[in-house]
Regions:
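Intrinsic-disorder/low-complexity loop/linker signature
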Residues: 17-18, 43-44, 63, 70-71, ...
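C-terminal beta-signal and adjacent terminal beta-strands/loops
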Residues: 54-65, 95-164
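Residues that define the transmembrane beta-barrel architecture of outer-membrane proteins
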Residues: 27-33, 85-89, 98, 148-152
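Extracytoplasmic gating/loop element in the C-terminal half of outer-membrane beta-barrel translocons
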Residues: 51, 62, 67, 72-83, ...
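Extracellular loop and loop/strand-boundary signature of outer-membrane beta-barrel proteins
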Residues: 16-25, 75-80, 90, 115, ...
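Histidine (H) residue identity feature
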Residues: 20, 24, 29, 82-83, ...
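Flexible, surface-exposed loop regions and adjacent strand-edge segments
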Residues: 14-23, 64-74, 118-128
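Gram-negative outer-membrane beta-barrel transporters
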Residues: 1-63, 155-162
Length: 164
C-alpha cells in the first residue's frame, strides 16, 4: 500500500484584483493511494494480483467550462472548478509452467472514463456531431482521467534458461 499527498501551487496574476495569487496548480491531483494484493499457490503454478488506485480531485484551469450534464466536477467556495476523485481497479491471473507462463489481465475494471475529454471537439451539422479540430474552442489538454474504458489483455512470457 502507498499514499501520496501533493500540494502543488503556482502564482498567477489576477487582473481584476490587480495582485498575484497563490493557487493550486491545474490538473494536479491532491492525492493518490494504491493498495496491491498478490497470492501465489503453494506449488507456484498460479498467481493472482489485484491493485486498487484512488486518484484525488484537482483544480481545472481557469476558463474551463463544465460539460453539460456531467457529474464529474464540483465548484469550490472560491468559484473554481475541480474534477472529482475516481477509483481504478486492475487485475491479473498468471499460470506458470517450467520455462514459460501465460497471463490474463484487465485494466480500468471500474470502467471510469472522463466525460468529453476534448473540449470543443465537436460541432453539429445536419443533425450529426462532427469532429472539428480547427474550432477556436478545440482543446485536447484537459485530460485528467482515463479516456478509454476497461481493457482486457492476454500475454505470454518465455524465460531463457541460463547456465549458472
Amino acid at each position: 500500500a502507498a499514499f501520496r499527498y501533493t500540494d502543488v501551487k503556482q502564482t498567477t496574476f489576477n487582473t481584476a484584483a490587480n495582485k498575484y495569487l497563490l493557487r493550486d496548480k491545474p490538473l494536479q491531483n491532491k492525492f493518490k493511494g494504491i493498495i496491491t494484493t498478490s497470492y501465489q499457490t503453494p506449488l507456484k503454478t498460479w498467481q493472482f494480483d489485484l491493485t486498487a488506485q484512488f486518484n484525488g480531485s484537482g483544480r481545472m484551469p481557469d476558463g474551463f467550462v463544465v460539460p453539460v450534464g456531467s457529474n464529474q466536477y464540483f465548484t469550490d467556495e472560491f468559484g473554481q472548478n475541480h474534477h472529482k476523485w475516481y477509483p481504478q481497479l486492475l487485475g491479473q491471473v498468471t499460470k506458470f509452467f517450467r520455462t514459460w507462463s501465460i497471463y490474463l489481465g484487465a485494466e480500468n475494471m471500474t470502467n471510469f472514463t472522463q466525460d468529453n475529454p476534448i473540449v470543443g471537439s465537436t460541432i453539429e451539422h445536419n443533425g450529426h456531431h462532427l469532429v472539428d479540430p480547427s474550432s477556436p474552442t478545440y482543446d485536447a489538454s484537459m485530460i485528467w482521467a482515463p479516456i478509454h474504458g476497461w481493457k482486457l489483455y492476454l500475454g505470454f512470457r518465455w524465460s531463457l534458461e541460463r547456465d549458472e
